[in-house]
Each structure stands twice: as structure tokens, then as C-alpha cells.
Amino acid sequence: MARATLSAAPSNPRLLRVALLLLLLVAASRRAAGAPLATELRCQCLQTLQGIHLKNIQSVKVKSPGPHCAQTEVIATLKNGQKACLNPASPMVKKIIEKMLKNGKSN
């Protein structure tokens, strides 16, 4: 009975290259399929509020215009955990942002 020997290195380097290329393609396609594109390629604020009482706000995040959205977005995180989009042009929202910046509660 002849014994089969196992070699640590593959006997066909071309087969190894093809297998590695296939592995890379599969890994890249799975990453692309799992990427959250919908939230990255559009504005987060579809509707805005003119203002909200300052005592209900935990923090404020101001997102500058960019490739994902052409407008400035102001997103307030409320003390109850909800998020609310505020109108950045509203005088009340401008005052809220100033107070939050002064208190150090903005992102």
C-alpha cells in the first residue's frame, strides 16, 4: 500500500493565485453588500422642527453640507434618547446652538 504524502506548499502556484483572487473577490463583494449605503448617501433630516425646549435637549450635532446632503443639518439628541432634526435657519435653533456650544454639550 502506497502512502499519500501531504505537502505544505501547493503543487500548482497558478491554482493558488486563482483561489486567492476568488477569496478576495468574495470578501470584497460581501463587504459591499453589507455596507449601509442608504444612510450615507442622503440627508438624515427630511423634516425639521422650528425649535424645542432647551431643558429637553441632551446634546446637539451640527452636520455641515457635503456629498451626502447639500444642506446643514442640526440633530438634537433629547434626554429621553430620541433624536429630533431642527431647522438651522430658525432663530430659536440658532439660540439653542449658541447655548449648547457655551455649555459644551454639542458634538
From Swiss-Prot:
User: Where does the record say this protein resides?
Assistant: Secreted
Q: Which InterPro entries match?
A: Chemokine_b/g/d, Chemokine_CXC, Chemokine_CXC_CS, Chemokine_IL8-like_dom, CXC_Chemokine_domain, Interleukin_8-like_sf
Q: Which UniProt keywords apply?
A: Chemotaxis, Cytokine, Disulfide bond, Inflammatory response, Pharmaceutical, Secreted, Signal
Coarse class of the protein's main subcellular location: secreted
The disulfides recorded in the entry are: 43-69, 45-85
Q: Which domain of life is it from?
A: Eukaryota
Cellular component terms (Gene Ontology): extracellular region; extracellular space
What does it do? Produced by activated monocytes and neutrophils and expressed at sites of inflammation. Hematoregulatory chemokine, which, in vitro, suppresses hematopoietic progenitor cell proliferation. GRO-beta(5-73) shows a highly enhanced hematopoietic activity.
Q: According to its UniProt record, which protein family does this protein belong to?
A: Belongs to the intercrine alpha (chemokine CxC) family.
* Name of the featured protein: C-X-C motif chemokine 2
Tell me the organism: Homo sapiens (Human)
